[in-house]
């Protein structure tokens, strides 16, 4: 898909060697490209949080609490797989790390409500056995969506999940069970609530404080207070698959920016069904295909300057285009991936081109709105903006036009917002208003608390892998051992 390219006017000397060159300007806004680059660098500096040893320990304590909670959920009714494989992503659902609808999500703000956010994909069904027949029924769904029939599963699985299915009786007397995203989410929220209630009856020293538990559509959002930090976990029940869906097979035949940088096996190692339906889909039955695991791999091939431009652009549009709901950060992420395919790698690798990339992303987004066309990166025949009204797309296109006319001012506003969020976080840390956790060296307390070696190990992982997504393998019968996979490395 062809999209608009960034507009920039290279310096010229008016044909006279003895005259100084003009500064490089953005043709549309007149902004100096050098100034835009500096503003993006300043935004990046304030947006990226540095973790000291205490913060690293708090991150691990929160993660361990969440995994322990999920282990107890599994033991409630044995529905979840005994040895499960979670995908932990840095950034919450509202940040666009997964293609989920944001309409039903409560608004949380960094600094006001939380300091760090994560998304955790938790397989309710883990279909990794290639001998397990699976029926993805796409006859009733829009592109990139599917129903999941349990008809070919064993009786034990059907019996276990029957209360989370919609049941369809056929004329021939056969009964079909369709795994219901809404019923699974209801069960998951109820189970988590029961477990948290039990945990809070027997509080242990150093245990995180559960500040908020809310069901946002099909997502369960938990905010934990740990030491001086508040951490938001958006927990999403999913169906996990190995391999690659047939509907996305043609995408593999095309040339892509990641060719030769990572292997095809890394990209197509698996996919998910996430609990979201299409605009006209049946909420109780329809799931959305998600390639979150593949996106973790693709992210490794994106230049730092393009990623900085993406983060700055996301910060600008996330509030500007929040009402009416039409554009999510995931749309912007898809456009960035298309840009990586479209543009030469050596162009995208230039460190001082963040301003050009930011302007290009704004142009691309406006182009997509005006044409009401944003193809899914993995299933291009799926237009993610198809359902929007002409009135909505033109409203947002006009808002983006104001950004494009003065990108520097909108960058300054984004910088002020992130600085204000950081000030709120620092103020909370000074007040020490959340539950304090003991230091690893302190005497007494729960013997299962992380020790100093674990804190140092976690700090090392965080330092060496800033912003990376983490896969976690966990056995609910043994949650005391770390089970990290950061990209393709195991720890």
Swiss-Prot record:
The modification Phosphoserine is found at residues 436, 439, 442. Keywords: Nucleotidyltransferase, Phosphoprotein, Transferase. Belongs to the mab-21 family. It comes from the Eukaryota. Its EC number is 2.7.7.-. Residues 431-452 are annotated as: Disordered. Residues 431-442 have a biased composition (Polar residues). The modification Phosphothreonine is found at residue 435. Changing residue 311 to E: Found in patients with squamous cell carcinomas; oncogenic. It comes from Homo sapiens (Human). This is Nucleotidyltransferase MB21D2. The lineage of its organism: Eukaryota, Metazoa, Chordata, Craniata, Vertebrata. It is an enzyme of class 2 (transferase). GO terms for molecular function: cadherin binding; nucleotidyltransferase activity; protein-containing complex binding. InterPro entries: Mab-21-like_nuc_Trfase, Mab-21_HhH/H2TH-like, MAB21L/cGLR. It holds the Pfam family Mab-21_C. Probable nucleotidyltransferase that catalyzes the formation of cyclic dinucleotide second messenger in response to some unknown stimulus.
